[in-house]
């Protein structure tokens, strides 16, 4: 259903930074008994590795060369996806200020996207997944019937970011994600919008499940 070779399906959850998509995707996966995959964590992991190697995140050739010499392994622990680079789990570093400031540049490199999209699609060879990101419904799984675009007002997203102790510019991140040439942030064809600005977490998850039911998911 997700790709011609897939044995399982994917629920695509897309949206801008701090829209609530990660929380909704995680709780959806728990409620439905599916594996949750945070595609953004993959890009953050590559960003973390590139910064650790003192590479310029805007030097696409250097970052592409790095990808050829590192081992990225993806899996899952129950309903949670996992990622290691050269055997190291970088989870604790993925939300650092440095990674926040540079992940958009890394994500815009075509070689990075090509490598990680292959890993993302690989999850459906073994599991039904809820995958969240910025191009899941438009690029990674364009044929899935289950697509939600989660959004919220910019000021609310900025407040959420601040409450989480993260320092970056929502406006700058939105501009970078929406204007990049490779897989920009868009509302995928067939996706239903969900505005979480005035919803509780449980309310957002309930709304997402209702959308998926309308899209044909038997949940």
Residue spans for each PLM region:
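Hydrophobic anchor at the beta1->P-loop junction of P-loop NTPases
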Residues: 13
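ATP-dependent NMP and nucleoside kinases share a basic, alpha-helical "lid"
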Residues: 91-163
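Hydrophobic positions on the alpha1 helix immediately C-terminal to the Walker A/P-loop
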Residues: 24
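Small-molecule kinase domains that catalyze NTP-dependent phosphoryl transfer to phosphate-bearing small molecules
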Residues: 75, 123-127, 134-143, 163-207
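Walker A (P-loop) phosphate-binding loop of P-loop NTPases
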Residues: 18
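N-terminal phosphate/diphosphate-binding loop that engages ATP/GTP or pyrophosphate donors
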Residues: 27-96
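Extreme N-terminal, non-catalytic leader segments
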Residues: 1-10
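Conserved lysine of the Walker
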Residues: 21
């Amino acid at each position: 259903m997700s790709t011609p070779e897939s044995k399982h399906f994917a629920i695509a959850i897309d949206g801008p930074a701090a829209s609530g998509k990660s929380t909704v995707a995680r709780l959806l996966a728990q409620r439905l008994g599916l594996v949750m995959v945070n595609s953004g964590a993959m890009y953050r992991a590559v960003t973390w590795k590139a910064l650790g190697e003192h590479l310029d995140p805007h030097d696409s050739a250097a970052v592409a060369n790095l990808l050829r010499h590192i081992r990225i392994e993806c899996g899952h622990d129950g309903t949670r996806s996992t990622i290691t680079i050269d055997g190291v789990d970088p989870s604790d570093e993925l939300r650092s200020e440095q990674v926040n400031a540079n992940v958009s540049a890394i994500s815009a490199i075509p070689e990075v996207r090509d490598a990680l999209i292959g890993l993302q699609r690989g999850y459906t060879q073994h599991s039904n997944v809820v995958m969240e990101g910025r191009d899941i419904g438009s690029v990674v799984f364009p044929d899935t019937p289950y697509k939600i675009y989660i959004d919220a007002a910019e000021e609310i997203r900025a407040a959420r970011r601040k409450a989480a102790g993260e320092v970056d510019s929502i406006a700058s991140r939105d501009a970078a994600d929406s204007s990049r040439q490779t897989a920009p942030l868009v509302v995928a064809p067939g996706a239903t919008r969900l505005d979480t600005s005035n919803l509780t977490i449980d309310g957002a998850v309930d709304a997402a499940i209702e959308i998926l039911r309308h899209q044909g998911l038997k949940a």
